[in-house]
């Protein structure tokens, strides 16, 4: 097999663009790019191209932006590119079986977890939410299931107690491209050894919702602190004061028991706002009132100390 593969790349956000960049700098030939249609963005709701489209057009690569790949006409576009392999990174559209079967080497996916743990839509966030100490990327052969295909390569990285979804996303965006290129080298040299996923180890990374981000004081402080990091930068953990959402950017869990009702303010000072939970105390150190920028707890107390009088109950 030739060392240089004809690749159709399918991806949309910056995470995907990092992988496309690595392919463009390699010996392989990217013959076409699939990405989601331009979307309204910003206050002016101006139609904005995806980071993948911007990069592809800078490099004069053919870009196709179908709303679906279920139509025969759109499938013909993929066929006409005559790819050896189709590489999917955070694309956002389902690839029907007929598309999966077009390239001789099938379709590869870069997935943001160590499969079979965290199949599904939000693997980066769920690894933080669950308190995992390690994650990574898996390069897998795609089939018609949801992240069920054989695994070809894994790259690992530790999760630190300071990591948020934003920082973990950045870590995986840094290790994923190299893992992808190594996988392609294994394939072209005939050394690839696909590994079947162990169904007994499967967990699912459900999509995040804004409602899930509402802080539930009936949970433990440790779990709430993990949620705050997992939901940063979206959808952002929050509670309400006077009907206004207050986003929480940073907090720490204190393993100290208290007999007061969960959601009760214990104290508030320049070190933070201490709130009772079902198990332990959550000290909130950085928050963002509606319509304001993120600020330290000390800054918010300068203007809204009455909100956090000890004994007050927070929704």
Curated annotation (Swiss-Prot):
- Which Cys pairs are S-S linked? none
Keywords, in A-Z order: Protein biosynthesis, Transferase
Chain residues that bind (6S)-5,6,7,8-tetrahydrofolate: 113-116
- Catalytic activity reported: L-methionyl-tRNA(fMet) + (6R)-10-formyltetrahydrofolate = N-formyl-L-methionyl-tRNA(fMet) + (6S)-5,6,7,8-tetrahydrofolate + H(+)
InterPro entries listed in its UniProt record: Fmt (IPR005794), Formyl_trans_C (IPR005793), Formyl_trans_C_sf (IPR037022), Formyl_transf_N (IPR002376), Formyl_transf_N_sf (IPR036477), Formyl_transferase-like_C_sf (IPR011034), GART_AS (IPR001555), Met-tRNA-FMT_C (IPR044135)
Under Enzyme Commission nomenclature, its number is 2.1.2.9
Q: Name one GO cellular component term.
A: cytosol
Tell me one Pfam family matched here: Formyl_trans_C
Instruction: Kindly give the Gene3D superfamilies that the UniProt entry links to this protein.
Output: Formyl transferase, C-terminal domain, Formyl transferase, N-terminal domain
SUPFAM superfamilies xref list: FMT C-terminal domain-like, Formyltransferase
One GO term in the molecular function aspect is: methionyl-tRNA formyltransferase activity
Tell me which HAMAP family the record gives.
Formyl_trans
| Role description | Attaches a formyl group to the free amino group of methionyl-tRNA(fMet). The formyl group appears to play a dual role in the initiator identity of N-formylmethionyl-tRNA by promoting its recognition by IF2 and preventing the misappropriation of this tRNA by the elongation apparatus.
Give the family, as the similarity comment puts it: Belongs to the Fmt family.
Q: What is this protein called?
A: Methionyl-tRNA formyltransferase
Species the sequence originates in: Photorhabdus laumondii subsp. laumondii (strain DSM 15139 / CIP 105565 / TT01) (Photorhabdus luminescens subsp. laumondii)
């Amino acid at each position: 097999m030739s060392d240089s593969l004809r690749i159709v790349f399918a991806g949309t956000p910056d995470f995907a663009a990092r992988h496309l960049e690595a392919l463009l700098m390699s010996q392989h030939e990217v013959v076409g790019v699939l990405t989601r249609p331009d979307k309204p963005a910003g206050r002016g709701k101006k139609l904005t191209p995806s980071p993948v489209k911007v990069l592809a057009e800078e490099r004069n690569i053919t870009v196709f932006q179908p709303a679906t790949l279920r139509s025969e006409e759109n499938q013909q576009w993929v066929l006409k590119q005559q790819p050896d392999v189709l590489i999917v990174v955070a694309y956002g559209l389902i690839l029907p079986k007929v598309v999966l079967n077009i390239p001789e080497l099938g379709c590869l996916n870069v997935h943001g977890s160590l499969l079979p743990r965290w199949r599904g839509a939000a693997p980066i966030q769920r690894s933080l939410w669950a308190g995992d100490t390690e994650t990574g990327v898996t390069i897998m052969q795609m089939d018609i299931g949801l992240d069920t295909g054989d695994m070809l390569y894994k790259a690992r990285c530790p999760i630190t107690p300071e990591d948020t979804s934003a920082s973990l996303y950045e870590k995986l965006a840094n290790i994923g491209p190299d893992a992808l290129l190594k996988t392609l080298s294994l394939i072209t040299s005939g050394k690839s050894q696909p590994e079947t996923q162990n169904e007994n180890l499967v967990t699912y990374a459900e999509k995040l919702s804004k409602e899930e981000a509402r802080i539930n004081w009936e949970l433990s402080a440790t779990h709430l602190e993990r949620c705050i990091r997992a939901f940063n930068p979206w959808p952002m953990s929050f509670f309400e004061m006077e009907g206004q959402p207050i986003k929480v950017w940073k907090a720490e869990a204190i393993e100290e028991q208290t007999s007061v009702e969960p959601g009760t303010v214990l104290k508030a000072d320049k070190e933070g706002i201490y709130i009772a939970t079902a198990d332990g105390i959550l000290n909130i150190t950085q928050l963002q009132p509606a319509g304001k920028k993120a600020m330290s707890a000390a800054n918010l107390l300068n203007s809204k100390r009455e909100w956090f009088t000890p004994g007050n109950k927070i929704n």
